[in-house]
Amino acid sequence: MKDMEINEKIRYFRKQRELSQELLAERTGINVNTIRKYEIGIRKPKVEQLKKIADGLEISVIEFLNIEIENEADLIA
């Protein structure tokens, strides 16, 4: 998981939760074509979109980062 690119992680978590691209688009307010482009790596999501995707997948945005931390509070410190 740590070696996966963001586009691979978006697809992985979406499939793990058995969500279609259309449903993820509805949950996030991001156009379904944009979700598709993120998943195949044509576009990279900006931080705001990544947060919306994380919320739509019901995960922490930290899941998309290739870093290891003890907890989210460590990001602020």
Residue ranges and their predicted role:
Residues 29-44:
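Recognition helix of helix-turn-helix/homeodomain-like DNA-binding domains
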Residues 4, 15-16, 44:
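Short amphipathic helical patch at the helix-1/turn junction of helix-turn-helix
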Residues 48-63:
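DNA major-groove recognition helix of helix-turn-helix/homeodomain DNA-binding modules
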Residues 10, 24, 35-38, 64:
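Conserved hydrophobic/aromatic packing and binding residues within compact polymer-binding modules
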Residues 63-77:
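Short, charged recognition helix plus adjacent turn
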Residues 8-27, 52:
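Short basic helix-loop element that most often maps to the first helix and adjoining turn
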